[in-house]
Amino acid sequence: MKIGIIGASGKAGNEILKEAKKRGHEVTAIVRNASKVQEQDVAILEKDVFELTAEDIKPFDAVVNAFGAAPGQEHLHVEAGRALISILKDAKHTRLLVVGGAGSLFVDEAKTTRLMDTPEFPKEYLPTASNQGENLKDLQQTDSISWTFLSPAAFFDPAGKRTGSYQKGKDNVIVNAKGDSYISYADYAIAVLDELEHPEHKNERFTVVSEAE
């Protein structure tokens, strides 16, 4: 597959890039600053997400949105998401997979309370969580593109090990055998590539959890 990764120089984006390369896919890092791409032997499209056009993304079978917003700029998650929705309408054969957040996952079966609505949710993560949640809403109201939104577990561990396995859920927080909502970046990247290779969640959100080792 031809896969473009927006934000490939970030932690999550880099893990997804490595996993895609490991599986033999043709990967392009879509970044604002080419010098920040850590991997060697990867094609680079040096362009801001807001400058991307339908022509830029038409060559890809899938585009992964691992866009990272700086503190105080969290609203850019929504704006970047809308920019991508707009250009994807003219790139019908390119699928979008969004690296989402856990904050918009529900904690009750009735789906009335989200993780970010609970008193335990760290206040410093609220701006990111709420804006990523808004991005999900925009996608859910769009029927003219092919998208998937992948929410990590509550503890999204950049230093965690690659166990090679994970469990899936839909819109609710799920936990592992120890009762923890946990996934490493490496196992999350596996889930991303599995979904791109064998799509099971077209135009919906799903979530993943794994064991911490």
Curated annotation (Swiss-Prot):
Molecular function GO terms recorded: oxidoreductase activity, acting on the CH-NH group of donors, NAD or NADP as acceptor
- Superkingdom per UniProt: Bacteria
Entry's InterPro entries? NAD(P)-bd_dom, NAD(P)-bd_dom_sf, Polyketide_Oxido-like
User: Which Pfam families did the record assign?
Assistant: NAD_binding_10 (PF13460)
* SUPFAM superfamilies the record matches: NAD(P)-binding Rossmann-fold domains (SSF51735)
Gene3D superfamilies the record matches: NAD(P)-binding Rossmann-like Domain
- TM ranges are none
> What's the protein name?
Uncharacterized protein YwnB
Specify the species: Bacillus subtilis (strain 168)
